[in-house]
Amino acid sequence: MNKIRKGDEVIVLTGRDKGKRGTVSLRKDDSHLVIEGINLVKKHVKPNPMKGTTGGIVEKAMPIHQSNVAIFNAATGKADRVGIKVQADGTRVRVFKSSGAEIKAA
């Protein structure tokens, strides 16, 4: 079970975007996330008339490792760690480590 999922609001812990918040838009693999508005780089794109794309400089969000982000707890207004709790019926749910409150699915 992934502790950080698509649609979760996260806060960046390290790097040039430290302290910024954003929403996870894509999981590249088990360890990398693409977050809206975070880790933006400028890519130089060649024009391709076959695909109908124009050339130029495009800003693009690049993947960031999940160890460099933490889930944002709206109740406390701070970053928090995620734990897994097994309920009585055997289902597993994500909870905030600080409060034990269940994380709502996005």
From Swiss-Prot:
Top-level taxonomic group: Bacteria
SUPFAM superfamilies: Translation proteins SH3-like domain (SSF50104)
One of the GO BP terms on file: translation
InterPro entries recorded: KOW, Rib_uL2_dom2, Ribosomal_uL24, Ribosomal_uL24_CS, Ribosomal_uL24_KOW, Translation_prot_SH3-like_sf
Disulfide bond positions: none
Keyword Ribonucleoprotein tagged: yes
Classification via PANTHER family: MITOCHONDRIAL RIBOSOMAL PROTEIN L24 (PTHR12903)
Oligomer status and interactors: Part of the 50S ribosomal subunit.
Function: One of two assembly initiator proteins, it binds directly to the 5'-end of the 23S rRNA, where it nucleates assembly of the 50S subunit. One of the proteins that surrounds the polypeptide exit tunnel on the outside of the subunit.
HAMAP family linked: Ribosomal_uL24_B (MF_01326_B)
Family classification: Belongs to the universal ribosomal protein uL24 family.
Protein name as catalogued: Large ribosomal subunit protein uL24
